[in-house]
A protein has these predicted regions:
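Short acidic, glycine/proline-enriched helix-loop-strand junctions
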Residues: 92-111, 194-206, 246-256
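Chitinase-like catalytic core of GlcNAc-active glycosidases
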Residues: 1-134
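A structural motif corresponding to the C-terminal end of an alpha-helix
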Residues: 74-79, 104-110, 145-153, 224-235
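Generic structural signal for well-ordered alpha-helices
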Residues: 67-71, 95-102, 139-146, 226, ...
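Short catalytic/ligand-binding loop motif for oxyanion handling, primarily in non-cytosolic enzymes
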Residues: 91, 121-122, 163-167, 245-248
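Glycan-binding loop/region signatures in secreted carbohydrate-active enzymes
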Residues: 153-225
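Acidic/aromatic/glycine-rich contiguous surface patches that form carbohydrate-binding/processing clefts
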Residues: 225, 231-256
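Alpha-amylase-like alpha-glycosidases and glucanotransferases acting on alpha-linked glucans and related
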Residues: 121-151, 155
Length: 256
């Protein structure tokens, strides 16, 4: 693929560079005001892209000064782009912030990445399409996004999922820690299947009369997601570094 971002916390080392992965530095947040908040970073850290979340932000205020802070930090650190890792419903303040960043990034040669809910606010930006779904197929979701935004603007946002759903499933399931998933598999010894439509592994189990569905990712499923996006002509992806860093060799053992 042409553009692979690896989201990593501040200070976490990676071997991603040998696979052509670009670091997305998870050290920044839109805080009250709004203003830019950031973790303490090594003075020499430069390059890659900034990853920005909005956890705890109340949605109030004028974002102009915050945008200046964000763009100034990009200049100081040599960041080539900004990933807006914004969860929840868009607020007017954050939509305005995205619009300002989109205009400035386009003028300054930086790339802006936004969730699909902010796509209309960033006409020059890339649109992040989550890999998570419990019905339909990932192929259909990516094809729909490529039709709406164009293949060049569409970026697959890979999530490392471990979730337990009561059946019938709807929305998101209960997150499982890795140890909890391993204990569940060891205790139940279930038949584990790979769903090509979801590009994920799953198994089912019963607790009394209630049925449950467990969906989870592995290096194989991440690779399948990337292969699918590549076949569809979608050349960008954002990967969850803390989860997949130990598996990079397995995922990228040959060129995608």
């Amino acid at each position: 693929m042409k553009e692979l971002l690896l989201a990593l916390p501040a200070g976490m080392s990676t071997e991603g560079e040998k696979f052509g992965l670009i670091r997305a530095c998870m050290a920044y947040r839109v805080g009250p005001g709004p203003r830019l908040l950031g973790a303490r970073l090594p003075a020499g850290l430069r390059g890659g892209v900034m990853q920005l979340d909005c956890a705890g932000f109340d949605g109030d205020g004028d974002p102009v000064d915050c945008c200046r802070q964000i763009l100034g930090e990009c200049r100081r650190r040599g960041f080539k782009g900004i990933v807006c890792d914004f969860e929840g419903a868009p607020s007017d303040c954050l939509m305005k912030l995205v619009t300002i960043l989109d205009r400035n990034c386009a003028a300054q040669g930086r790339t802006l990445y936004v969730p699909e809910s902010y796509a209309a606010s960033a006409p020059a930006g890339r649109v992040l399409i989550s890999s998570v779904l419990t019905h339909g197929t990932l192929e259909r979701r990516l094809l729909g996004a490529a039709e709406r935004y164009g293949k060049e603007r569409t970026v697959l946002a890979v999530e490392w999922v471990r979730e337990d759903f009561p059946l019938p499933a709807g929305g998101r399931g209960r997150p499982l820690a890795q140890e909890e998933l391993e204990n569940l598999i060891r205790r139940l010894e279930p038949a584990v299947f790979f769903d090509k439509g979801l590009c994920a592994h799953y198994f089912t189990y019963m607790v009394g009369p209630k049925a449950y569905f467990v969906l989870f990712d592995t290096p194989r499923s991440v690779r399948e997601k990337l292969d699918l996006a590549n076949r569809l002509g979608i050349r960008g992806a954002l990967l969850p570094g803390p989860e997949i860093e130990p598996h990079l060799d397995e995922i990228f053992r040959s060129d995608l």
